[in-house]
């Protein structure tokens, strides 16, 4: 706290000193802000005014420039201007300037939020306002302080807690008890009751070591199982003498001289994960014929690829551990009796390419009975509590045991995962995919404009509950947690915000919390592989792909005909919604005549054959047709309906490579960018948004290019320059293609992902057992917040019924 106050005082004093030495310059600047009247100014607006003013004399404003460039927003209530200043990711200060009196004062988070609320209320709310603050519960909890440590939580946790827990022999007893507690459905693993003390454990390990060093390394565990039982050792150490000896050496090293790296390796080696539940309630979750349906996109692909890799890793580790246990993975989603031609009405569906993974579907129900039709992800909240109870019963029925890990996906899945983990006492993992608060700017302060349509009061509350309850959080990128130097991260945006009339969040999450871990996914390499692998190419699809791209026929699957089929293709594939910005790409292309001359545009989005139930998609459809007419794009553009066959989509990416085209991802914000990974894995040069995950996936100019969709003219110029360089240098396209592939192999594969997830589950499961990582105090606070606030918000959401739509 002292450091924070010192920083605030330093900031206030710096600004005050700048006012004293440069009063005229700063009056001129802040007057520009005040003259815009009551409202909120975003970072780019603040800097635009600043840059316009300093153009004539930059030296005068230099002392203030660093402060202003760190400001993320300003609240203007004349004569006051309040600034939210972010010196670095995860660190925030708040100040207020009275332009009339040249006075500067620091603000607490609560004071800043109360000031901000006046934008809506028009006056300070003098009544007591509910404030949500998780900071006191984490005050004594270890956390890193450097931005570079964000997202590397498990490494920090291991360093801190291994030194704390293993400082003397007595402190090692939790590890002994943890190993003794290991069992699966009543079958003891690792240690039996013959070992009662650390001395006994070390003695048995030494005897086992001596025995193993005297037999062939490939001796199966079954040949010395009984001898080990007499020593107090059970199955789980390994499947052969060498692997058992390696595990024993790891533990002996830990008992002698604890080391965080060895601890993580040991915990990743021992058996801890056999039953996994993955929750993804909303949308149409199935293996085919669903991509492009409302609320159905990258998350479905992510989970299906995830479970295949995870099952393979679980089977491999179980075999290496010398166990005869069958793992089970359940993807739990909503059952839709009105399945509209999909398998979403089928209770259990085997996941293709797996042996022990099923999709388990459980219906939404209320006092009106089972809900038959799809509803928007924004309308699910009144159903989730009852749904959780039904899911718990179905899981126990299918698994005949509690899961070892529950993984939530998106806001609804994470809330159900929270309720289940709380009920069953199971390790919980959270994957956000996208936090809507960042996708819809100012949806917190101007909640009234959004809430009747999107029910964000429910969703933001559910997000806060889940992210604070969970044991660990997986993100695909650093940006998802803490943004970049200039942009705020998705989770970071939940540090402090206000929902006027409901509550203020003065400390909602700490991005330095060691529960955060970056674990990036990949693409299914049996589907997405480089276009150069000619013997694997699916040429049987080429006639269908040529029909999609070049047919002279217009129908419900493809609209508009390309005039020049010899041009390279600018290709994009996404859902048709505002944030994905497919209409923005079309407008950018339409405005730039040079770009139209250089390349054709092919977009895959929406469904021409079915009237969407989603209002946002309906609006984008109308806008798209308007842009195509406005810029006379017939002959230059091909608009293809959403494609459900991902195997053919893989070959479609490779076919675009054959045209020497590019993949463009133009989203205003993209949490990760699975299509970016897919395109790069196929060798297709990729040009993607700089907002969100693609900014990390792509190294600009090496493995692809960045564009800013908020500056569409510059984005179009980047595309023009790319194609011009390709014309001038025949190796340029290949260099970007190969750079993308190299980036994928280094960081973005499902094999790396599944190995990391297994290790994280072991490490967090261990620390949860041996320490206060369960955060009991926090969870009691969450229980109260859930009961008193979330439930009332959820009950206020109109209950969807069959025969009408409340979709958005």
From Swiss-Prot:
Keywords: Glycosyltransferase, Phosphoprotein, Stress response, Transferase
Superkingdom, natural source: Eukaryota
Reactions the enzyme catalyzes: an NDP-alpha-D-glucose + D-fructose = a ribonucleoside 5'-diphosphate + sucrose + H(+)
UniProt EC number: 2.4.1.13
Single Gene Ontology BP annotation: sucrose metabolic process
Enzyme class: transferase
InterPro entries: Glyco_trans_1 (IPR001296), Sucrose_synth_GT-B1 (IPR000368), Sucrose_synthase_pln/cyn (IPR012820), SUS_EPBD (IPR056736), SUS_N (IPR056735)
Region (GT-B glycosyltransferase): 272-749
GO MF entries: sucrose synthase activity
Effect ascribed to mutating residue 10 to V: Loss of phosphorylation
Matching Pfam families: Glycos_transf_1 (PF00534), GT-B_Sucrose_synth (PF00862), SUS_EPBD (PF24862), SUS_N (PF24861)
Regulation of its function: Activated by phosphorylation at Ser-10 by CPK23.
Description of post-translational modifications: Phosphorylated at Ser-10 by CPK23 in developing seeds.
Tissue: Predominantly expressed in the leaf tissues. Expressed in seeds, and at lower levels in roots. Expressed in leaf mesophyll and phloem (at protein level).
The family this protein is said to belong to: Belongs to the glycosyltransferase 1 family. Plant sucrose synthase subfamily.
PANTHER family in the record: PTHR45839, SUCROSE SYNTHASE 1
Subunit structure: Homotetramer or heterotetramer with SUS1.
Name of the featured protein: Sucrose synthase 2
């Amino acid at each position: 706290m002292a450091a924070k106050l010192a920083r605030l005082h330093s900031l206030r004093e710096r600004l005050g000193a700048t006012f004293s030495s440069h009063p005229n310059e700063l009056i001129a600047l802040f007057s520009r802000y005040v003259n815009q009247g009551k409202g909120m100014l975003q970072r780019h607006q603040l800097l635009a005014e600043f840059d316009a003013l300093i153009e004539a004399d930059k030296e005068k404003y230099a002392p203030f420039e660093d402060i202003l460039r760190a400001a993320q927003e300003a609240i203007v209530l004349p004569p006051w201007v309040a600034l939210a200043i972010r010196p670095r990711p995860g660190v925030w200060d708040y100040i207020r300037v009275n332009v009339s009196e040249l006075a500067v004062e620091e603000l607490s988070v609560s004071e800043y939020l109360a000031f901000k609320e006046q934008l809506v209320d028009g006056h300070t709310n003098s009544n007591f306002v509910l404030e949500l603050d998780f900071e006191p519960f984490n005050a004594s909890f270890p956390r890193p302080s450097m931005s570079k440590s964000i997202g590397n939580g498990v490494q920090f946790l291991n360093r801190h807690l291994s030194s704390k827990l293993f400082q003397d022999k007595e402190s090692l007893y939790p590890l002994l008890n943890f190993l003794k507690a290991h069992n699966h459905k009543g079958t003891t693993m690792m240690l039996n009751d013959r070992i009662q003390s650390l001395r006994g454990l070390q003695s048995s390990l030494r005897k086992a070591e001596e025995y193993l060093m005297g037999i062939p390394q490939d001796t199966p565990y079954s040949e010395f199982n009984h001898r080990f039982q007499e020593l107090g050792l059970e199955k789980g150490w390994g499947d052969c003498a060498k692997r058992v000896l390696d595990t024993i050496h790891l533990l002996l090293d830990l008992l002698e001289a604890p080391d965080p790296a060895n601890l993580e390796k040991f915990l990743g080696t021992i058996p801890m994960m056999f039953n996994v539940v993955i929750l993804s309630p909303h949308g149409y979750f199935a293996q085919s014929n669903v991509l492009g349906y409302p609320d159905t996109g990258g998350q479905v692909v992510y989970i299906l690829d995830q479970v295949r890799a995870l099952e393979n890793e679980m089977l491999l580790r179980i075999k290496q551990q010398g166990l005869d246990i069958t793992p089970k993975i359940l993807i739990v989603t909503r059952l839709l009796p009105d399945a509209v031609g999909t398998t979403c009405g089928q209770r259990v569906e085997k996941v293709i390419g797996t042996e022990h993974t099923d999709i388990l579907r459980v219906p939404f129900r209320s006092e009106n009975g089972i809900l038959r039709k799809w509803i928007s992800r924004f309308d699910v909240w009144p159903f989730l509590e009852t749904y959780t109870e039904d899911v718990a019963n179905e899981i126990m029925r299918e698994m005949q045991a509690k899961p070892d890990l529950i993984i939530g996906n998106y806001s609804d899945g994470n809330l159900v995962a929270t309720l289940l983990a709380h009920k069953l006492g199971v390790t919980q993992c959270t994957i956000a995919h996208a936090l809507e608060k960042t996708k819809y700017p100012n949806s917190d302060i101007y909640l009234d404009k959004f809430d009747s349509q999107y029910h964000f009061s429910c969703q933001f509350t559910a997000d806060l509950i889940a992210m604070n309850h969970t044991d660990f959080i997986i993100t695909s990128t650093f940006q998802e947690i803490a943004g970049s130097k200039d942009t705020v991260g998705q989770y970071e945006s939940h540090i402090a915000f206000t929902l006027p009339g409901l509550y203020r969040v003065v400390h909602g999450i700490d991005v330095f919390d060691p529960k955060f871990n970056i674990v990036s996914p990949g693409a299914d390499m049996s589907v997405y592989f480089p276009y150069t692998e000619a013997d694997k190419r699916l040429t049987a699809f080429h006639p269908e792909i040529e029909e999609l791209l070049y047919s002279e026929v217009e129908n419900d699957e493809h609209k508009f005909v390309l005039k020049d089929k010899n041009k390279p293709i600018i290709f994009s594939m996404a859902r048709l919604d505002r944030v994905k910005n497919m209409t923005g790409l079309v407008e950018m292309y339409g405005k730039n005549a040079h770009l139209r001359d250089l390349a054709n545009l092919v977009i895959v989005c929406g469904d021409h054959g079915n009237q969407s139930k989603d209002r946002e998609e309906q609006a984008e459809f109308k806008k798209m047709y308007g842009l195509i007419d406005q810029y006379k794009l017939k002959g230059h553009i091909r608009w293809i309906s959403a494609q459900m066959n991902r195997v053919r989509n893989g070959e479609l990416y490779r076919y675009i490579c054959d045209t020497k085209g590019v993949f463009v991802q133009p989203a205003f914000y993209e949490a990760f960018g699975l299509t970016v990974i897919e395109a790069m894995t196929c060798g297709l040069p990729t040009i993607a948004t700089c907002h969100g995950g693609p900014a990390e996936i792509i190294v600009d100019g090496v493995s692809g290019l960045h564009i800013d969709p908020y500056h569409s003219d510059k984005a179009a110029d980047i595309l023009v320059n790319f194609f011009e360089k390709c014309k001038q240098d025949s190796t340029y396209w290949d260099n970007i293609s190969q750079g993308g592939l190299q980036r994928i192999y280094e960081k973005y594969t499902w094999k790396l992902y599944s190995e990391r997830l297994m290790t994280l589950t072991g490490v967090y499961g261990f620390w949860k057992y041996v320490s206060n990582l369960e955060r009991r105090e926090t969870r009691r606070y969450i229980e109260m917040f859930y009961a008193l606030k979330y439930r009332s918000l959820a009950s206020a959401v109109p209950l969807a019924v069959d025969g009408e739509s409340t979709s958005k």
